[in-house]
Amino acid sequence: MNDFVLKTRDLNLYYGTFHALKNINFNVHKNSITALIGPSGCGKSTLLRCFNRMNDLIDDIRMSGDIFVHDQRIEDVDIIELRKKVGMVFQRPNPFPFTVYGNMVYGLKIHGLGNKKKKRNMAENCLRAVGLWEELKDKLSTPALDLSEEIKQRLCIARLLTVEPEIILLDEPCSALDPIATMRVEELMMELKQKYTILIVTHNMQQAARVSDYTGFMLLGDLVEFGETSQIFTSPSDERTEGYITGRFG
């Protein structure tokens, strides 16, 4: 029995007539961090958005092939339930224009989960999980938009955790952060993979090498190579992968 929580089979995606993803096939292991790397425009963020159907919001999209979460086709899952199970954190922190506490209980309210006491306990537990409880426990009524960029991003991750996802999608979560804040978010990812499965899109190859267990290199809509991160970075099997990670292009 395998431990794959997410699989793609012959996945293709078109923006109008533009073929953005081409026959993508790979498996994601449970409780792992999988990094998607490649030059701008290669399709890695488009692929990430497929996994919780965020691309459905874009006009003139056409897809073929299959995506499975726990062997269930995502098209057969209620989209609200899918986005509860497969949560996403975006490139720039996007807290809601509420208080810190309002952000933390928003998902619970939307999904009708828990009474007032349970919501408060869940908010505390998830803030603790991302290392923010001590910093924010006396600031729960503070507008979330007043926080620093790093704290906003960690708050967005904590907010996602309240609805107990299985898979966390991170689309360049550190691109707006300084090196110290980036290090903290990377440490958080390493802690979270004990309980969750994480996919991250990153332009930072050093970050991919530091935090991920598996790496996929994408180029012009193709998944050129996928494997264990140590193998991808030390002995890639495709010369295009080697060219990218050694800086010959990208």
Q: What residues fall within each predicted segment?
A:
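ABC ATPase "signature
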Residues: 226-227
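Short helical segment in ABC ATPase nucleotide-binding domains corresponding to the A-loop/adjacent helical element
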Residues: 48, 101-110, 120, 141
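Conserved ABC ATPase signature
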Residues: 142-147, 151
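Catalytic Walker B motif of ABC-type/P-loop ATPase nucleotide-binding domains
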Residues: 168-171
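Conserved ABC ATPase "signature" region
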Residues: 71, 117-137
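ABC ATPase NBD Q-loop/coupling interface
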Residues: 66-81, 141, 232
